[in-house]
Amino acid sequence: MAEKNDSRSSITSVAEKELGLLSRHLDVLKTVKEHGPIGIIRLSQMTGQPQHMIRYSLRTLEKGGAITPSPNGAVITDDVHETLGTLESTLDDFTVTVQDLKKKLK
């Protein structure tokens, strides 16, 4: 059984890591949307993520145009809905890709 898990992680580890990162970014974005303006310490407390991971997520979300810093903490931008729409479309594409990969296994 251990071989199976090792094999699984070596084949899919990058994808799993990136999906985990995406999940964290979405958790941070949702928290900013619901509680903003909000600072790093409070985000860390609310999400249970270390502050350095919160900083990275905030930088990524800011670069993507979903949030912006303010004197009182991070706030969502007017572009957040466009960002979420693009993300939803991309996840739909991922779903199709995953289904195609499953078909290749058969």
What are these regions (language model features)?
Residues 48-62:
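Short amphipathic alpha-helical interaction segments
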Residues 21-37, 45:
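Short amphipathic alpha-helical interface segments
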Residues 2-3, 85-106:
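Amphipathic alpha-helical dimerization/coiled-coil segments
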